[in-house]
């Protein structure tokens, strides 16, 4: 890229380009030239690589070949969407001057900046996923995290107390863009993220942030938001607001509040647990294999986004959960959910439309969609009439009619508007008299000219008179040369031809001025009227946002009612007493996508039963049994019904899972290291109110090492943490833990042998398993029979050796790792003593001897 400080060697157009580019060094600059957006120099090379564009060159400027690539202006949204997904930011530079009056390059300026976290255009967003902008400030080990959804207006603050907590929150939120200070060294996990944007350190100043928040919300302090003590997070929030003002170049009236989060109000879910429970992601990439894929039948996009947020932040507040349960129960009782579900399918994305109105970027079809949604409100309220649920009553109260707004939209916007205001034809006829006249002129020019020609023939008596038009002379009256001397005095000669004279009259000149610019003036008038309309619509922003929130929550509740009805789920009981009791529990996703009938199973945890050691065959269903327990608990804490015959759930603070593992090649961590990192997180952070799933701990190392770690981890969870723990293992030795810890029980997944085959019953039974059926599973997987036969011979050999070792070690019952240590000679001497036969003197002498031998 040429040095912008020395522009004298460049052409005037390149000078203009380089000056504008210097203001946006880290963004791709889309520079409008006619019907294309052009990119030059390094921007062109980068865009060509990212978008698979043809890279060309256009002569030289300043002694350097000008690399260039172009994008048609009418296709820009598709290219922007691809760049945003890649984490790129774009500055869009438009022609704002008039080419006809410009001396030198037409005046241009950046009119729009698009970044991953500030996108609001419908075409650039995933409709059912939040698009978040985050800012991170740091002071030692404490972080300030501010997160804003520009397209929805939600604004939150928190202060994670460690790098691990910060990364866990970022994993949950998955922001499209993260703002960090230019002088902040990044962790390895942060530095690899897309959409990372550096900002000046002073943008994170807490006092500056406080002033910006007070200005944004029009308050004198932040006490009402509960965040005055979160200095670091306030600094991060100030950085967000400044960044939005820099990029949006407009006020942000839809950002009306901010909420402080402590984390204690939600069930804790770390990144591993979200991944292992497959909430909204599956390794196959198939959405139908995820919990969200099964749950989401919402009618509106904003309902879908809210459901996703609920899944990732299950609540601990039982009052809110019971309100949701009661609402779902009432919708089920009289099947109102069916009518609601149908009505909500016609509801638009009012949340994002309101944000675009606030940012003055709403498109014509946004307004027609809003108009249709407002028309649906009376039917929704009528459907909810008479409900007793407090929550449904509150949501109904948010669906307020806006007759003035509805009337304005009906009067201002045509029934089926084009996508863009620049296309014209958006403002309805009758809304503005001048616009109607301009359109009439443009549309009826031919009729006017025919009428003028007839009128002039009558007035002059010249039958050969014609009224015509060409692009050079404009409109004219033409007379044959033979009749030119009879032209009226008010005719002004415009052009002389070989056989004719052409004239213009004041009336024709006035018409020409109107018609030639009528289209341009109509478009200009329409654009001004549309911008004024958006300004007027801003008055209804609070009401629209409140309505959107009500519609979204109503959509989720109706959706959960439909799922409960369709999939035969029940309302769980949320109780104060510790424990988890599930009768006939089912894994909701496996039940629906599996090819065979699902076998329900029970689970019982209580004050005196805190851990189940689960053994059984491979493919027997251990992981499914564990996951379904966690999913049922999670679903109960979003207010949903659950897949079970009965469920009773006591207080839960966190859900941890350690299920499956793979190498973290990018992070340089082996499978075993990943497993141990996740295990350490659980052992260090789980509490007596946590639900813990541990699957096959220790399998990534040697047998004795793995068994030792598995035993110690299970014992720590059982004795020290006392978390509700499902501990699946192939180490049969772990079943002995139940004999040492009264809170530990054994269960197994049942299977039966039929010849050389094994049939998995998937039923959970009390007690440990008898064997793992590994050879049978290998045969099912297609391992060659010769290998299976060889493995069976080796197994028999190993079992004979184990029996022999067991007999030699008798009467010790425990094998391998847990054989008791060889007793000390002093212990053996004491065990052989006849205490009753010793005299006092002999006892003292013996005690002295024993002391000497230690």
From Swiss-Prot:
SMART domains: MUTSac (SM00534), MUTSd (SM00533)
Recorded superkingdom: Bacteria
GO MF term (any one): ATP-dependent DNA damage sensor activity
SUPFAM superfamilies: DNA repair protein MutS, domain I, DNA repair protein MutS, domain II, DNA repair protein MutS, domain III, P-loop containing nucleoside triphosphate hydrolases
Annotated organism of origin: Methylococcus capsulatus (strain ATCC 33009 / NCIMB 11132 / Bath)
Keywords: ATP-binding, DNA damage, DNA repair, DNA-binding, Nucleotide-binding
Residue ranges that the Swiss-Prot or TrEMBL entry lists as coiled coil: none
Binding positions for ATP per the UniProt entry: 616-623
One GO CC annotation: cytosol
Function: This protein is involved in the repair of mismatches in DNA. It is possible that it carries out the mismatch recognition step. This protein has a weak ATPase activity.
HAMAP family, per the entry: MutS (MF_00096)
InterPro entries with a match to the protein in the record: DNA_mismatch_repair_MutS, DNA_mismatch_repair_MutS-lik_N, DNA_mismatch_repair_MutS/MSH, DNA_mismatch_repair_MutS_C, DNA_mismatch_repair_MutS_clamp, DNA_mismatch_repair_MutS_core, DNA_mismatch_repair_MutS_N, DNA_mismatch_repair_MutS_sf
Pfam families the UniProt entry points to: MutS_I, MutS_II, MutS_III, MutS_IV, MutS_V
PANTHER family: DNA MISMATCH REPAIR PROTEIN MSH1, MITOCHONDRIAL, DNA MISMATCH REPAIR PROTEIN MUTS FAMILY MEMBER
Gene (UniProt): mutS
Recorded family membership: Belongs to the DNA mismatch repair MutS family.
Protein name as catalogued: DNA mismatch repair protein MutS
GO biological process, one term: mismatch repair
Lineage of source species: Bacteria, Pseudomonadati, Pseudomonadota, Gammaproteobacteria, Methylococcales
């Amino acid at each position: 890229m040429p040095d912008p400080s020395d522009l004298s060697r460049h052409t005037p157009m390149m000078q203009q380009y380089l000056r504008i580019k210097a203001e946006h060094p880290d963004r791709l600059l889309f520079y409008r030239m006619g019907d294309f957006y052009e990119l030059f120099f390094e921007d062109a090379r980068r865009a060509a690589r990212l978008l698979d564009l043809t890279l060309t060159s256009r002569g030289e400027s300043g002694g350097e070949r000008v690399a260039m690539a172009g994008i048609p202006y009418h296709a820009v949204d598709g290219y922007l969407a691809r760049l945003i997904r890649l984490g790129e930011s774009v500055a869009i530079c438009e022609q704002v001057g008039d080419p006809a009056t410009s001396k030198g390059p037409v005046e241009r300026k950046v009119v729009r900046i698009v970044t991953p976290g500030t996108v609001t255009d419908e075409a650039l967003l995933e409709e059912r996923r939040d698009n978040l902008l985050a800012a991170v400030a740091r002071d030692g080990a404490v972080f300030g995290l501010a997160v804003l959804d520009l397209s929805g207006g939600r604004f939150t603050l928190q202060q994670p107390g460690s790098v691990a907590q910060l990364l866990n929150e970022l994993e949950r939120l998955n922001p499209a863009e993260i703002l960090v200070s230019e002088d902040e060294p990044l962790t390895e996990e942060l530095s690899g993220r897309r959409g990372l944007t550096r900002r000046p350190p002073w943008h994170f100043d807490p006092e500056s942030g406080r002033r910006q928040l007070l200005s944004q919300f029009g308050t004198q302090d932040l006490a009402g938001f509960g965040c005055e003590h979160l200095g670091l997070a306030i600094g991060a929030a100030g950085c967000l607001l400044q960044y939005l003002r820099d990029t949006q170049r407009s006020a942000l009236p839809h950002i009306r509040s901010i909420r402080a989060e402590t984390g204690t109000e939600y069930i804790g879910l770390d990144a591993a647990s979200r991944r292992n429970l497959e909430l909204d992601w599956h390794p196959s990439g198939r959405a139908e294999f995820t919990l969200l894929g099964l749950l989401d039948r919402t009618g509106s996009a904003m309902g879908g986004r809210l459901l996703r947020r609920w899944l990732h932040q299950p609540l601990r507040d039982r009052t809110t959960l019971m309100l949701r349960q009661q609402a779902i129960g009432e919708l089920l009782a009289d099947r109102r959910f069916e009518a609601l579900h149908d009505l909500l399918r016609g509801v638009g994305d009012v949340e994002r439309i309101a944000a675009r109105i606030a940012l003055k970027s709403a498109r014509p079809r946004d307004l027609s969609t809003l108009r249709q949604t407002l028309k649906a409100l009376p039917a929704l309220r009528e459907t909810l009439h008479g409900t007793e649920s407090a929550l449904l009553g509150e949501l109904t109260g948010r669906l307020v009619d806006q007759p003035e707004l509805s009337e304005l939209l009906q009067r201002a916007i045509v029934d089926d508007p084009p996508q863009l205001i620049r296309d014209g034809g958006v403002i309805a006829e009758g809304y503005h008299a001048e616009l109607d006249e301009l359109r009439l002129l443009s549309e009826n020019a031919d009729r006017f000219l025919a009428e003028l020609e007839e009128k002039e023939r009558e007035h002059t008596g010249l039958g050969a008179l014609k009224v015509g038009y060409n692009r050079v002379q404009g409109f004219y009256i033409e007379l044959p040369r033979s009749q030119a001397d009879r032209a009226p005095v008010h005719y002004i000669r415009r052009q002389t031809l070989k056989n004719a004279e052409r004239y213009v009259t004041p009336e024709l000149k006035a018409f020409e001025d109107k018609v030639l610019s009528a289209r341009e003036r109509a478009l200009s008038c329409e654009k001004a009227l549309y911008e004024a309309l958006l300004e007027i619509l801003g008055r209804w922003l609070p009401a629209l946002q409140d309505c959107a929130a009500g519609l979204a929550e109503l959509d989720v509740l109706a959706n959960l009612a439909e799922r409960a009805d369709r999939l035969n789920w029940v309302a769980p009981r949320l109780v104060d007493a510790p424990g988890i009791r599930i009768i006939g529990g089912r894994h909701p996703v496996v039940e629906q996508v599996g090819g065979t009938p699902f076998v329900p199973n029970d689970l019982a945890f209580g004050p005196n039963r805190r851990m189940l050691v689960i053994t059984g065959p491979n493919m027997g269903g251990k992981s499914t049994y564990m996951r379904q327990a966690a999913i049922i608990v999670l679903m109960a804490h979003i207010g949903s019904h659950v897949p079970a015959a009965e469920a009773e759930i006591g207080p839960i603070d966190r859900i941890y899972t350690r299920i499956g593992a793979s190498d973290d090649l990018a992070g340089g961590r082996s499978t075993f290291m990943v497993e141990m990192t996740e295990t350490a997180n659980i052992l260090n952070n789980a509490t007596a109110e946590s639900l813990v799933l541990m699957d096959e701990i220790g399998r990534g190392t040697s047998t004795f090492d793995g068994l030792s770690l598995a035993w110690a981890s299970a014992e720590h969870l059982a004795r020290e943490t006392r978390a509700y723990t499902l501990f699946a293992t192939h180490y049969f030795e772990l079943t002995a833990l139940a004999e040492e810890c009264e809170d530990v029980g054994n269960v197994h997944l049942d299977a039966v042998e039929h010849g050389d085959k094994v049939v998995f019953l998937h039923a959970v039974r009390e007690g440990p398993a008898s064997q793992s059926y590994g050879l049978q599973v290998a045969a099912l997987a297609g391992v060659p029979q010769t290998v299976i036969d060889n493995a069976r011979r080796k197994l028999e050999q190993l079992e004979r050796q184990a029996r022999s070792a067991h007999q030699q070690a008798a009467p010790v019952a425990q094998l391998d790792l847990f054989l008791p240590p060889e007793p000390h000679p002093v212990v053996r001497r004491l065990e052989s003593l006849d205490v009753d036969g010793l005299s006092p003197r002999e006892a003292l002498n013996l005690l002295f001897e024993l002391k000497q031998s230690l």
